[in-house]
Amino acid sequence: MKENKFEMIYKIYKILLDYYGHQNWWPAETRYEVVVGAILTQNTSWKNVERAINNLKMEDLLEEVKILNVDEDKLKELIRPAGFYNLKAKRLKNVTKFIVENYGNTEEMAKTDKDTLILRAELLSINGVGKETADSILLYALDRESFVVDAYTKRMFSRLGVINEKAKYDEIKEIFEKNLPKDLEIYKEYHALIVEHCKKFCRKKALCDNCPIKEFCLSK
């Protein structure tokens, strides 16, 4: 099609929003719960994360200082449903320690006037926090305009011909941020819509027949 491939990005957002409606992602009662979820969701499904978070809620532990002070073995058992619980317990302690020592809590961190790129660099300096996790925390916990790229994003937009399937994380992130309005809610919704679309249609084995954006797709 003659349309610039990057111009598709915003058009596809509007089509997906019309098709699926608002996703209202991230489901959390507090900013810190988003941080916890961003760590726990690494390499697992959200259903498993929900089970782990519910365990923490049952023990009244979803606060920064409480997570810092809880025995690590107890924490491991509580987050076991999310998998890789030994690793994630350490990562959860690491990111929480950083927040408490530098900001007091996540609410205060969200109020800082530091530039988003500085905050991102701080998060990436924490052991166990990669780019997707850092951007998830920035976007959904701290309300910063930092687009989240995940495996679904790469799969879907390489099939659409917008990105090369070997494109690096920051390259993909930059393409989205340059071709979308700089709008917090659009960033939040679009990431969630991509996830939903890849679960419904753009699976590993794609279901193209009734896909709402198949007119744009090179793989159909």
Curated annotation (Swiss-Prot):
SMART domains noted in UniProt: ENDO3c (SM00478), FES (SM00525)
Q: Which keywords describe this protein according to UniProt?
A: 4Fe-4S, Iron, Iron-sulfur, Metal-binding
Q: Which GO molecular-function terms appear in the entry?
A: 4 iron, 4 sulfur cluster binding; catalytic activity, acting on DNA; hydrolase activity; metal ion binding
Bound cofactor: record note:
Binds 1 [4Fe-4S] cluster.
Q: Which Pfam families does this entry report, sorted A to Z?
A: HhH-GPD (PF00730)
Q: Which SUPFAM superfamilies match?
A: DNA-glycosylase
Annotated binding of [4Fe-4S] cluster, by residue? C202, C208, C211, C217
What does the record give as cofactor? [4Fe-4S] cluster
Which segments of the protein form a coiled coil according to its record?
none
The GO annotation for biological process reads:
base-excision repair
PANTHER family reported for this sequence: A/G-SPECIFIC ADENINE GLYCOSYLASE/ENDONUCLEASE III (PTHR10359), DNA REPAIR GLYCOSYLASE MJ1434-RELATED (PTHR10359:SF19)
- What family does the entry list? Belongs to the Nth/MutY family.
The protein here is known as Putative DNA repair glycosylase MJ1434
